[in-house]
Amino acid sequence: MTQTGKSNIEAKAFARYITMSPYKVRRIVDQIRGRSYEEALMILQFMPYRACNPVLKVLYSAAANAKHNLGLNKSELSISEVKVDQGPVMKRFQPRAQGRGYPIRKPTCHISLTVKGLK
């Protein structure tokens, strides 16, 4: 919970260590940045990408934080900041023929979302 200035009140939510490439999640996040809460929900629910699910969970969490901690109405919220950072990369090996092993990289990412409401 952050209060900046007189009229902007912000609530934040985070998702860490999501097993997905940050590049793929940024493609989704760029579509909802700066939009209203309800508009972002519509966009995320109808996009056909797997990365929409964790972003949708973070958006629900940020809206719940704004309602519970700050007493804001969900219809008055807008997304002020969304950030996707790279997390640690899990390194695995895939066994191959003749005793070889091919490396597999499993990237992770951290999603941070901030919603603001005007009181």
Curated annotation (Swiss-Prot):
Cited PROSITE patterns: RIBOSOMAL_L22 (PS00464)
Compartments, record wording: Plastid, Chloroplast
InterPro entries for the chain: Ribosomal_uL22, Ribosomal_uL22_bac/chlpt-type, Ribosomal_uL22_bac/org-type, Ribosomal_uL22_CS, Ribosomal_uL22_sf
UniProt keywords, alphabetically: Chloroplast, Plastid, Ribonucleoprotein, Ribosomal protein, RNA-binding, rRNA-binding
GO biological process: translation
Membership in a protein family: Belongs to the universal ribosomal protein uL22 family.
Protein name: Large ribosomal subunit protein uL22c
Gene Ontology cellular component list: chloroplast; large ribosomal subunit
Function of the molecule: This protein binds specifically to 23S rRNA. The globular domain of the protein is located near the polypeptide exit tunnel on the outside of the subunit, while an extended beta-hairpin is found that lines the wall of the exit tunnel in the center of the 70S ribosome.
Pfam family, one: Ribosomal_L22
HAMAP family xrefs: Ribosomal_uL22_B
Description of how the protein assembles with itself and partners: Part of the 50S ribosomal subunit.
PANTHER family registered for this protein in UniProt: CHLOROPLAST 50S RIBOSOMAL PROTEIN L22-RELATED (PTHR13501), LARGE RIBOSOMAL SUBUNIT PROTEIN UL22M (PTHR13501:SF10)
Nucleotidyltransferase in keyword set: no
UniProt keyword Cytoplasm present: no
NCBIfam families linked: rplV_bact (TIGR01044)
GO function terms (MF aspect): rRNA binding; structural constituent of ribosome
